[in-house]
Amino acid sequence: MGGWSSKPRKGMGTNLSVPNPLGFFPDHQLDPAFKANSENPDWDLNPHKDNWPDAHKVGVGAFGPGFTPPHGGLLGWSPQAQGILTSVPAAPPPASTNRQSGRQPTPLSPPLRDTHPQAMQWNSTTFHQTLQDPRVRALYLPAGGSSSGTVSPAQNTVSAISSILSTTGDPVPNMENIASGLLGPLLVLQAGFFSLTKILTIPQSLDSWWTSLSFLGGTPVCLGQNSQSPISSHSPTCCPPICPGYRWMYLRRFIIXLCILLLCLIFLLVLLDYQGMLPVCPLIPGSSTTSTGPCKTCTTPAQGTSMFPSCCCTKPTDGNCTCIPIPSSWAFAKYLWEWASVRFSWLSLLVPFVQWFVGLSPTVWLSVIWMMWYWGPSLYNILSPFMPLLPIFFCLWVYI
């Protein structure tokens, strides 16, 4: 084989007039298989070269659009391999041997007495009796049976049809009662949650009023800020947990909450005593312990003994009551405990623990109060997300 040619390049890689669909073999110094020799080193000057007459044909061949290889390519001499698309007729489907295909005849309907037993009640006699009903005749015939007149109002029509056909079919549920039964608890729940959010703002408002008494004429500023806990300036009613004044804010709100609870108890005591619901026997001022009024319900007889003071009334034959006065708060607490014990039977298991807790020394009580003041803020932060669930549980307990 010859080496590189010294004359200008005229090979397939440079002569654009010669089709070169694949673009490789830059110098085309091929082997003697194509009769290349030193006299005709270039492919373009070889008289025995194959001119690739099929290379000018552009079509879908074995190598994709525009790449139709000559000499049949890799897939042979078929028309598809040469890039010629031919349509092959599809073979017809085999004849069906299923004689049952196609529309089948409609099956016979079951008897009416099996599908609609309620319709069997309307026999000819019942139908004629219904037509004789004045309410039905009023739907189609005017008053007096003449062909002129006015038709009954629509509400009479509906009531007549509903009253006549009420004996057949299943009763329709009253959706109005169902909706009202669900709407009531939802309204109570919404009102309870709204009231709770407003009640929770009362201690904060009273705390703001309390702290404003120490800053007359100025803006209240928390005095608990120091170098050990550098925090931004804030109001004493909005101390963060890292502020030293946070525990004092919690103590103020705890006292405010106790005062609000005391006012609510006084109001409830006055209301229940006015309605005669408290198990406390009345005492007339300036008189003896014997009252001439009617006896109220008493939980402990007069001759019985109790470790706590209670109102004991007896009802002798003359109708008088012998009463021992006690604080109304204890009577109210006992009344609430009895009411809750009836509702929740498991509360009776707490009686020994409550009696033991009440019998503790004042030192233990002071220790408990101190622990509540010390750990109360952290417990409040833990339990505060669950506060809105209390009215929800209460509504579920009342309505379920």
UniProtKB/Swiss-Prot annotation:
Chief subcellular location: virion
Listed transmembrane segments: 182-202, 254-274, 349-369, 376-398
Pfam families from the UniProt entry: vMSA
Subcellular location: Virion membrane
PTM annotation: Isoform M is N-terminally acetylated by host at a ratio of 90%, and N-glycosylated by host at the pre-S2 region. Myristoylated; this modification is essential for its interaction with the host protein SLC10A1/NTCP.
Keywords noted in UniProt: Acetylation, Caveolin-mediated endocytosis of virus by host, Fusion of virus membrane with host endosomal membrane, Fusion of virus membrane with host membrane, Glycoprotein, Host-virus interaction, Lipoprotein, Membrane, Myristate, Transmembrane, Transmembrane helix, Viral attachment to host cell, Viral envelope protein, Viral penetration into host cytoplasm, Virion, Virus endocytosis by host, Virus entry into host cell
InterPro entries listed in its UniProt record: HBV_HBSAG (IPR000349)
Lipid-acceptor residues (N-myristoyl glycine): 2
Location of the region described as Pre-S in the Swiss-Prot/TrEMBL record: 2-174
Annotated spans, Pre-S2: 120-174
Glycosylation, residue list: 320
Keyword check for Chloroplast: no
Compositionally biased tracts (Polar residues): 96-106
Biotechnology remark: Systematic vaccination of individuals at risk of exposure to the virus has been the main method of controlling the morbidity and mortality associated with hepatitis B. The first hepatitis B vaccine was manufactured by the purification and inactivation of HBsAg obtained from the plasma of chronic hepatitis B virus carriers. The vaccine is now produced by recombinant DNA techniques and expression of the S isoform in yeast cells. The pre-S region do not seem to induce strong enough antigenic response.
Source organism superkingdom: Viruses
Subunit structure comment from the entry: Interacts (via its myristoylated pre-S1 region) with the host SLC10A1/NTCP; this interaction is essential for viral entry.
Free-text note on domains in this protein's UniProt record: The large envelope protein is synthesized with the pre-S region at the cytosolic side of the endoplasmic reticulum and, hence will be within the virion after budding. Therefore the pre-S region is not N-glycosylated. Later a post-translational translocation of N-terminal pre-S and TM1 domains occur in about 50% of proteins at the virion surface. These molecules change their topology by an unknown mechanism, resulting in exposure of pre-S region at virion surface.
Family under the similarity heading: Belongs to the orthohepadnavirus major surface antigen family.
HAMAP family tied to this protein: HBV_HBSAG (MF_04075)
Function: The large envelope protein exists in two topological conformations, one which is termed 'external' or Le-HBsAg and the other 'internal' or Li-HBsAg. In its external conformation the protein attaches the virus to cell receptors and thereby initiating infection. This interaction determines the species specificity and liver tropism. This attachment induces virion internalization predominantly through caveolin-mediated endocytosis. The large envelope protein also assures fusion between virion membrane and endosomal membrane. The middle envelope protein plays an important role in the budding of the virion. It is involved in the induction of budding in a nucleocapsid independent way. In this process the majority of envelope proteins bud to form subviral lipoprotein particles of 22 nm of diameter that do not contain a nucleocapsid.
Protein known as: Large envelope protein
Annotated organism of origin: Hepatitis B virus genotype B1 (isolate Japan/Ry30/2002)
Gene: S
